Amino acid sequence: MQIESDFLVIGSGIAGLSYALQAADHGKVALITKKEITESATNYAQGGIASVFSEEDTFDSHSEDTMVAGAGICHEDVVKMVVEEGPDVIKTLIEWGVNFTTRGDSYDLTREGGHSKRRIFHADDLTGREIERALVTAVFEHPNITVYENHTAIDFITERKIAKKQEVKNRCFGAYVLDVLGNRVKTFLAKITLLASGGAGKVYLYTCNPDVASGDGVAMAYRAGALIANMEFMQFHPTTLYHPEAKSFLISESVRGEGAILRRRDGTPFMEKYHKLKDLAPRDVVARAIDNEMKTYGDGCVYLDITHMDPDFIKTRFPNIFRTCLKFHLDMTKEPLPVVPAAHYLCGGVVSNINGETTITNLYAIGEVAFTGLHGANRLASNSLLEAAAFAGRAYRHSSERLTTEQFSFPTIPAWDSGTATDSDEMVVVSQNWDEIRRFMWKIGRAH
């Protein structure tokens, strides 16, 4: 079965949805997503999206914070572009229906680790869910977008793959996609293909990523011949809830931004010996500090304490975190929360330029799956949603212009060849291998 469109979008987080909404004004869009359309890392993002807004803040300050967090290997031109497009990104999201939290007649900006100013737009502590809600609503209302849920991309369709010759120009014509419920592989042909499949947190034993973040977008691009870079830079979020019944529940960095303090089991604060910003140090610093404290004292976790703040403020500012912790009989207004680091964000990925182009013609990559140069070795808090939305706009403008100025035709595309392999009757073998890989990656990550 072949499905043709002008644009094929793989992924339904802020990157894919933002691109689809803009591309749909220029042509037909097919959007595929592994599970339900809302099952993305965006939907789980709590903290917010960073952008210069107040008169006390500047683009230079935001850029400097970004490059310091990135350990000096950020691409300065990309940092400058993304930071300066921040206000327009916020404006566009608001126009699409995103309701950011306000205070009086302005927006309630918060601060997170590594930021020198309050510049984080948020929707309580469910910012990602609010963004996803607004964008999904707009996507379903657009007549030029067709959404295919429970569809998993398997391989890109490229000219080299078809011709079986490395010397031919490597162009992308779409992807082979598994219809999970129908148990068949479909051929999605498109003039422009956008990869926005997210990260690879599920490669690690402990992660705050959803199950769909398994890294297959990077793997597909690698098999197709795209350039991949900086895969060693996996960011670990410092504070996920340490509880046997809590599945990878993240405690937002904005909790520390509002005054929470990291403590040892005996109540001693420890971040002052690791960084001058103490609990507001960049994520990599805080995560390593927590890991070191756990190893030094033989503890399974450390504690995040915000009990010195007004209980009503805590409940109002962090309603989702407060309610979720109560389910596990933890009252953050009265007791510190046990927390540990977990795999959170892939700073490397598929190499893409300032317009989202990869090294394969007509294949674009944006969002967490891409390495754009913004984050360097370590992402600054709340820069991911900003990057995804900014690059969605740039990729749309560049790719839509290509549609206008170039002639497109599809060669004869062979049907998917499933080969002679058969499904294993013993799924426990797959599960065991997957578990061993995740344990190995976690062990290696902690060792370094």
Spell out what each predicted region is.
Residues 3-5, 22, 36-38, 44-50, ...:
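Glycine- and aromatic-enriched mobile tails/lids
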Residues 51-82:
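Glycine-rich active-site loop/strand segments that organize a redox cofactor
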Residues 37, 220, 226-331, 335-337, ...:
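An anion/pyrophosphate-binding glycine-rich loop and adjacent beta-alpha core
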Residues 74-87, 119-137, 148, 207-215, ...:
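Short beta-strand to alpha-helix junction loop
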Residues 2-5, 182-192, 359-362:
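Core beta-strand elements of the Rossmann-like FAD/NAD(P) dinucleotide-binding domain
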Residues 95-184, 189, 196, 240-243, ...:
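Conserved redox-cofactor binding core of oxidoreductases
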Residues 149, 154-171, 178, 317-370:
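A glycine-rich dinucleotide-binding beta-alpha-beta segment and adjacent secondary-structure elements
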Residues 7-31:
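N-terminal Rossmann-like FAD-binding beta1-loop-alpha1 element of flavoenzymes
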